[in-house]
């Protein structure tokens, strides 16, 4: 009998703006999707195509997030763990085992879980979760870019690039920015002095 195994991964821990996303995916026993690997190794076009195929073929999948406010109140690590728990609890089927990318497991999952370092390159369920989390995170950045094109979110995806830091200085901090992240926090402190 096939054991329902979920893979879990996150996207968006490092950026200065937006939510941190996590996805949980349960795949069928015979699942095979050529080219599926760690989302960071895939082009955006390939990720988007794979995401659609994963959603169509998965036994269950769920994407969840923790907001910038939750990141500020919990810290990025705990907010990531919360997003992972939400992703697991949002699955339409209950997995019997969970593999989580990285070296930490959210507390009180209630399901046997194992952390796998570089799991997004080793375990297909984690690879699938990696793709879904990354495409959801990118979608949030594209939506923000539509509302605030001057920041260039569609290009740098919220990371602390030169373009993003210059836009922060020129246009200011948005409600979506992570106020507890050093570049944003430092800019707010400088502005408070003047």
UniProtKB/Swiss-Prot annotation:
Endonuclease that specifically degrades the RNA of RNA-DNA hybrids. Residues 3-193 form the RNase H type-2 domain. It comes from Neisseria gonorrhoeae (strain ATCC 700825 / FA 1090). InterPro entries: RNase_HII, RNase_HII/HIII, RNase_HII/HIII_dom, RNaseH-like_sf, RNaseH_sf. One of its GO terms (cellular component) is cytoplasm. It catalyses: Endonucleolytic cleavage to 5'-phosphomonoester. One of its GO terms (biological process) is DNA replication, removal of RNA primer. GO terms for molecular function: manganese ion binding; RNA binding; RNA-DNA hybrid ribonuclease activity. Its EC number is 3.1.26.4. Manganese or magnesium. Binds 1 divalent metal ion per monomer in the absence of substrate. May bind a second metal ion after substrate binding. This is Ribonuclease HII. It is found in: Cytoplasm. A divalent metal cation binds at residues 9-10, 101. Its cofactor is Mn(2+); Mg(2+). Belongs to the RNase HII family. Keywords: Cytoplasm, Endonuclease, Hydrolase, Manganese, Metal-binding, Nuclease.
């Amino acid at each position: 009998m096939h054991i329902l195994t979920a893979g879990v991964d996150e996207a968006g821990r490092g950026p200065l703006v937006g939510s941190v996303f996590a996805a949980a995916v349960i795949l069928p026993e015979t699942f095979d999707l050529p080219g599926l690997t760690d989302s960071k190794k895939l082009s955006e076009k390939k990720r988007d195509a794979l995401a659609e195929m994963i959603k169509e073929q998965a036994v269950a999948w769920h994407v969840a997030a923790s907001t910038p406010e939750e990141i500020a109140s919990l810290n990025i690590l705990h907010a990531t763990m919360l997003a992972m728990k939400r992703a697991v609890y949002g699955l339409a089927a209950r997995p019997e085992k969970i593999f989580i990318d990285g070296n930490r497991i959210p507390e009180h999952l209630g399901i046997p879980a194992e952390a796998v370092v570089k799991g997004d390159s080793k375990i297909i369920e984690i690879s699938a979760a990696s793709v879904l989390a990354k495409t959801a995170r990118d979608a949030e950045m594209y939506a923000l870019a539509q509302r605030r094109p001057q920041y260039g979110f569609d290009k740098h995806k919220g990371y602390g690039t030169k373009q993003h830091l210059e836009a922060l200085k020129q246009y200011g901090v948005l409600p979506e920015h992570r106020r507890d992240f050093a570049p944003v926090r430092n800019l707010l402190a400088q502005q408070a002095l003047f």
